[in-house]
Amino acid sequence: MKILISDNISLELFCKNPIKILEKSNKGIIGVLKNKSPIFYVITPYILKKIFDLECNLLDLDKTKQQISKKFSMHPQWTPDKDFIRQAALWGITLTEEILESELASFISYWQAEGCFFHHIQWQQKLARSLQKSRSISYMSQKKRDITYIPTPDQTVPNGFRGK
């Protein structure tokens, strides 16, 4: 299972006060590094329960059998499974946030117009890839640099070079 880890910390800093560092983490997951490579991961009990709590994510057997047994075209009432983010992680697609209603509505309206028929699991995989792509595009657009910025050089001469 792939999980996106945004917080990394060195082993030395982590050993000083691990509980405080874990409490400060954004997502409750920290990668502990030694020589810039991960040696282990630390996960809060809440996040661990959220990832592996299968009991609360069980679906009705009838609904599952119906969805597995035949293909269908996209319709406005379609929703992904409750454990969709965990399933996406199993498919190698890391989703860090829940699905927004606007994202789901956009996906449904696009595929309704297409009129394609797929199994429920295939629709979920398409949704996961769509979310991954759209979120990465919006993330990349936030990181764009200002093309009108003109850098000004500093006037320092490094040691070992001839200068003023």
Curated annotation (Swiss-Prot):
GO biological process: DNA replication, synthesis of primer
Keyword field: DNA replication, DNA-binding, Primosome
Domain of life: Bacteria
Gene Ontology CC: primosome complex
Primary role: Involved in the restart of stalled replication forks, which reloads the replicative helicase on sites other than the origin of replication. Can function in multiple replication restart pathways. Displaces ssDNA from a PriB-ssDNA complex. Probably forms a spiral filament on ssDNA.
Subunit description: Homooligomerizes. Interacts with PriB. Component of the replication restart primosome. Primosome assembly occurs via a 'hand-off' mechanism. PriA binds to replication forks, subsequently PriB then DnaT bind; DnaT then displaces ssDNA to generate the helicase loading substrate.
Annotated family: Belongs to the DnaT family.
Name assigned to this protein: Replication restart protein DnaT
